[in-house]
């Protein structure tokens, strides 16, 4: 088990997602509704405990924020909660959207 997360580029995040990694978006609900990585799940302080309780702690987890800053703190938190394979998306959703504009979705969180 790793005790630290890795910072990754959008290309690595996309590959991880295609191989089954869970992508979580920690931005505010309005920003998530306007646009997010296709297949990602919105989580916030109210839903994080339920997410952790139901999660496979050994499955890869990619954390996304606006620009790749807040996701680092969240990724460290997930490591502390027992996740073993955690990544923070450098550049956040803004960089993802510029690299993969067709690989985004809009709409409310599930």
Curated annotation (Swiss-Prot):
Active site: 65
Calcium listed as a keyword: no
Reactions accelerated catalytically: thiosulfate + hydrogen cyanide = thiocyanate + sulfite + 2 H(+); thiosulfate + [thioredoxin]-dithiol = [thioredoxin]-disulfide + hydrogen sulfide + sulfite + 2 H(+)
Enzyme nomenclature, EC number: 2.8.1.1
GO biological process, one term: glycerol metabolic process
Transferase found in the keyword field: yes
Residue span, Rhodanese domain: 17-105
Subcellular location: Cytoplasm
Cellular-component GO terms for this entry: cytoplasm
GO molecular function, one term: thiosulfate-cyanide sulfurtransferase activity
Pfam families given in the database record: Rhodanese (PF00581)
Highest taxon in the source lineage: Bacteria
Primary location group: cytoplasm
Keywords: Cytoplasm, Transferase
Cross-referenced CDD domains: GlpE_ST
Homology family: Belongs to the GlpE family.
PANTHER family in the record: FAD-DEPENDENT OXIDOREDUCTASE, THIOSULFATE SULFURTRANSFERASE GLPE
Function per UniProt: Transferase that catalyzes the transfer of sulfur from thiosulfate to thiophilic acceptors such as cyanide or dithiols. May function in a CysM-independent thiosulfate assimilation pathway by catalyzing the conversion of thiosulfate to sulfite, which can then be used for L-cysteine biosynthesis.
Protein name: Thiosulfate sulfurtransferase GlpE
Organism: Pseudomonas aeruginosa (strain LESB58)
Organism phylogeny: Bacteria, Pseudomonadati, Pseudomonadota, Gammaproteobacteria, Pseudomonadales
